[in-house]
Amino acid sequence: MNPVKKIYCRTFQFVMRVALPFLPYREPKLLDGVDGVAALLTKKKISRVLLVTDKGIRSHHLTEPLEKALAGAGIGVSIFDGTVANPTVANVEAARRMYLEDGCGAIIAFGGGSSMDCAKAAGARIARPRKPLSRMEGLLHVMRPLPLLIAVPTTAGTGSETTLAAVITDGETHHKYPINDFALIPPYALLDPE
């Protein structure tokens, strides 16, 4: 390894190790069931949400209890189920477009790591409309609050509902963009075994 690069890497590691306790990590607040999601959105006066998921989750009707709870509270739901494994820039842009066109006020990420990453990146693009995902690659390149983001994980293991990371793939070049920013940590999560 190039000695200058090695010194840079070691310095970066040292600085991050020292700074880590002072960085603004937060744990998502846990919501109590699907009714807790509806109550939160009602309290925040949000009348429509974007539900980001995938076709597999939708085909098993896993989103129905949440959809019914939101409908019962008078909250409209726009469903983006085009997320694929290793979400692409095109997925993110389609979700972002749906959010804006339908006048949504929050994003619910429902599913595994791919749905979470797609929702986080769509939120980042909504927060930074003039900044493409390719320029958000790396550490702390979003630096703006996202729309309200609620994570509903359906898998155990990815931990995307608590992380500051999202990985998006460029469908043409197959380059993966790791986006790491504290703004990507969802402020709320629903951990419901049902």
Language-model regions, residue ranges each:
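An N-terminal, well-structured beta->alpha segment
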Residues: 1-79
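Local beta-strand N-terminus motif with an aromatic residue
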Residues: 46-48, 104, 186
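Conserved beta-strand elements of the Class I
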Residues: 50-51, 106-108, 150
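N-terminal small/polar loop signature for handling phosphorylated ligands or for N-terminal nucleophile
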Residues: 58-130
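A glycine/threonine-rich phosphate-anchoring loop and its flanking beta-alpha core
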Residues: 127-194
